[in-house]
Amino acid sequence: MPASLFIVRATIADPAKRAAFDDWYRKDHLPWAVKAFGARKAWRCWSDTDPSWHIATYQFPDRAALDRGTTPEIMKPLVEDFDRVWPGIPRTREVMTMVEEIGAS
């Protein structure tokens, strides 16, 4: 089974808020989300193309595990907490299936 990825992009338009957002996401949100989702692992990045974009990626062993981990019941408290702490921050969510992975030869 190919791995599935759940990708969340948040746009932090105000540069003055990015350090606080980064700290909160690292200490509070990411550990909670990984545990709640049952993700295999997670990582996050700030875009060099658009510095306002924060992208968090959660990896699951397969699509069924992703679907079990991101039900509305599991997502609701995470979304509510995000909206409470960071009101008005737009987000997008994507589900992707890995189709190929190669390493250097």
Please place each PLM-identified region on the residue numbering.
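Macromolecular interaction modules
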Residues: 1-105
